[in-house]
A protein has these predicted regions:
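Conserved small/polar residues in nucleotide/adenosyl-binding loops
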Residues: 31, 175-177
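Flexible, low-hydrophobicity surface segments
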Residues: 1-169
Length: 177
């Protein structure tokens, strides 16, 4: 085999990790640096009825608290490319969702503060009122008739159908296996 394939490789980073000499992102402190913490959804699929940031805004050291409505006029983030020139119905999520969350952990608000602990404390004070919606947890269930619709622009929860290569030739060659 090659130099690394199938062989144990000596890790070079272990000595500095076990001796406490490694530098982590938390160790970096720059002048004027601020910290952001994103408030994330506890639900896999839910309507956002209201977001109350008033208590978070009162925490000393908080620079600002924003929700998706503050960025409503900004373009959503593209999350897919046109595979092989095929049109797709891929959802383009926003940095912070405004009306509906479609996965657990989706960002709904952000707190910027003087340090990370303050930002985390303030984030915990944001109250989000959700209306939970039905969910599915597998692709097979998601495309069945009557399954909860995640994105309106992807009927039957199908973003796109794409084939490439020689399907007929591949199917014929499988007969001989």
């Amino acid at each position: 085999m090659g130099k690394y394939i199938g062989e144990s490789v000596l890790r070079k980073e272990d000595p500095r990790l076990v001796t406490g000499e490694a530098k982590y992102l938390e160790d970096i402190q720059l002048s004027g640096m601020v910290h952001a913490v994103v408030k994330r959804s506890d639900y896999a699929h839910a309507k956002i009825k209201n977001i109350d940031t008033s208590e978070a805004e009162k925490v000393p050291g908080v620079i600002g608290v924003w929700t998706g409505k503050d960025f409503e006029d900004m373009n959503p983030m593209p999350c897919a490319w046109q595979a092989g020139g095929v049109d797709n119905n891929a959802n383009t999520p926003r940095v912070l969702e405004i009306d509906k969350v479609t996965f657990t952990g989706q960002g709904v608000a952000v707190v910027v503060a003087e340090d990370r602990n303050i930002a985390e404390d303030a984030s915990s004070k944001i109250v989000v009122d959700y209306e939970e919606l039905p969910t599915v947890v597998s692709a097979e269930e998601a495309i069945k008739p009557g399954a909860p619709q995640l994105h309106e622009n992807a009927p039957n929860n199908i973003c796109m159908e794409w084939e490439c290569g020689n399907q007929e030739g591949t199917e014929l060659s499988l007969i001989h296996i």
